[in-house]
């Protein structure tokens, strides 16, 4: 019965010319190879590594080839506590708070557009101020105080200026401070807390700034953490961090995410945007269950308990920003643009902190940082804050700058739509089939690879600079699978013919 049902289709198939039969078989094999690889994609050896290598190469390709005509006008200044500055300050164990105050005051009074401080501020350092340190405000009595107290008093008065209306809100830049985040502390009577990617981290409150920041609408804590891959490279950001603060569940945004939110003011589903409302909503959505913070052995909730993603919209770029507890590798990828040696005066400028704190006869002009995003950080070797990235080694503050720039200039990396991906893949399968039908297997493979490199590679690179990713690795794997499968049915086995001699059998 089944044999007779397929008889009409078989007759139509037999009427097709051999070339058409060969082409249709090739198309079917290519489609099967694509579907099988798509389903088994997480388990295909080498595929994830090849895709990571491809994005690394694309980042390095565009690093020095950026078009200066951009949709955004993000400009960054890095106040670098470099090796020379560190030695001039007497090689202190902690960044001197009186020097840090001078850097903060210089940027705030310029005024900068935003100030990000990537310096450890959890511990109180009871030191007396250095007599060589000169304040930009000689009448300010804070210079005779203990440095930590002077810094706290300045930040308190800075916030009060906003509340009292002494300065317009736009003239007082927001300040984002690096929150110290580490492993959970072990309880006195309990077993040691487990460590690893699946365990919660704990925020370490500042011993002298906690109350000042908590009561201010302009001062904020944020996470400086990033992900380090198995090969030691920092490729991915962590846009937020579920944590415990004391024994209470909490969620803290990354320095890049909070900076993006302050400058882009995304639409909120509940009322008007403010940094406080943004952080409250982030905590409401992504804070861990309360029980996990009570028990020191608490770990991240199981995968089926992860909250739904929070989709925000960047009106400047016209792109979505997806906050998820389980983001894809592509959604976390950092588009690195700046190195320590980058010379892009319109986009990035590195200023040794020594030029600001150690006054000379020709102090720097505040116009140098006015209207720009200022990041204070360190690059001296003893600070142990140097990281390997796809474009080379850089200090943690430079990683933060690249994260902020990536979010605001390119947005979160997203794949092109599924319709475009599969349409393009089917067209490539047609090209594979035609190549293998017109030419030998060797020539067909070479021509197919050439077409991918000549067409798909330029298109993928062009989209990459705008934060879109058109995968060129997966089609190459499909081509390899196609070459393996095509011998199964398309290539007929060789036929050995035996010729009988005329006198045989006589």
Regions found by a protein language model. Name each.
Residues 9-301, 369-444:
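Non-transmembrane functional regions of envelope-associated proteins
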Residues 295-306, 310-328, 362-364, 369-372, ...:
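Solvent-exposed, non-transmembrane regions of membrane-associated proteins
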Residues 63, 358-362:
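Glycine-rich, charged/polar anion/phosphate-binding loops
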Residues 1-18, 497-506:
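N-terminal Lys/Arg-rich, disordered targeting/topogenic segments
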């Amino acid at each position: 019965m089944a044999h007779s049902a397929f008889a009409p289709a078989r007759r139509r198939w037999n009427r097709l010319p051999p070339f058409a039969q060969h082409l249709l078989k090739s198309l079917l094999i290519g489609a099967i190879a694509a579907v099988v690889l798509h389903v088994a994609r997480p388990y295909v050896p080498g595929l994830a590594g090849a895709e990571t290598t491809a994005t690394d190469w694309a980042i390095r390709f565009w690093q020095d080839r950026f078009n200066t005509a951009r949709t955004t006008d993000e400009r960054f200044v890095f106040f670098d506590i470099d090796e020379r500055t560190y030695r001039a300050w007497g090689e202190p164990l902690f960044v001197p708070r009186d020097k840090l105050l001078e850097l903060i005051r210089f940027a705030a009074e310029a005024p900068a557009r935003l100030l990000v401080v990537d310096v450890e501020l959890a511990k109180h350092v009871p030191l007396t101020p250095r007599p060589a340190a000169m304040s930009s405000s000689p009448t300010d009595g804070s210079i005779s105080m203990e440095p930590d107290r002077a810094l706290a008093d300045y930040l308190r008065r800075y916030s009060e200026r906003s509340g009292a209306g002494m300065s317009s809100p736009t003239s007082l830049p927001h300040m984002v401070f690096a929150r110290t985040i580490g492993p959970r502390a072990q309880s006195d009577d309990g077993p040691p807390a487990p460590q690893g990617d699946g365990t919660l981290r704990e925020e370490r409150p500042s011993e002298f700034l906690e109350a000042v920041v908590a009561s201010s609408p302009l001062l904020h804590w944020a996470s400086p953490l990033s992900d380090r891959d198995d090969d030691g490279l920092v490729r991915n950001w962590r846009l937020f961090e579920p944590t415990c603060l004391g024994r209470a569940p909490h969620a803290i945004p990354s320095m890049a995410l909070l900076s993006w939110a302050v400058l882009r003011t995304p639409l909120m589903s509940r009322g008007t945007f403010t940094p406080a409302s943004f952080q409250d909503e982030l905590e409401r959505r992504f804070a861990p269950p309360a029980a996990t913070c009570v028990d020191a052995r608490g770990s991240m909730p199981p995968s089926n308990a992860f909250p739904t993603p929070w989709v925000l919209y960047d009106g400047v770029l016209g792109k979505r920003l997806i906050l998820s507890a389980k983001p894809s590798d592509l959604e976390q990828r950092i588009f690195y643009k700046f190195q320590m040696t980058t010379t892009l005066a319109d986009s990035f400028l590195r200023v040794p902190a020594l030029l600001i704190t150690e006054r000379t006869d020709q102090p720097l002009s505040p116009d140098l940082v006015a209207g720009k995003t200022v990041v204070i950080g360190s690059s001296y070797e003893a600070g142990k804050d140097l990281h390997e990235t796809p474009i080379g080694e850089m200090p943690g503050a430079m990683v933060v700058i690249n994260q902020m720039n990536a979010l605001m200039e390119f947005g979160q990396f997203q794949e092109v739509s599924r319709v475009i991906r599969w349409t393009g893949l089917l067209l490539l399968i047609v090209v594979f089939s035609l190549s293998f039908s017109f030419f030998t297997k060797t020539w067909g493979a070479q021509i197919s690879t050439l077409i991918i490199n000549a067409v798909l590679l330029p298109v993928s690179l062009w989209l990459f600079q705008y934060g879109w990713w058109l995968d060129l690795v997966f089609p190459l794997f499909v081509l390899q699978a196609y070459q393996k499968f095509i011998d199964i049915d398309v290539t007929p086995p060789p036929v050995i013919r035996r010729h009988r001699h005329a006198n045989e059998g006589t």
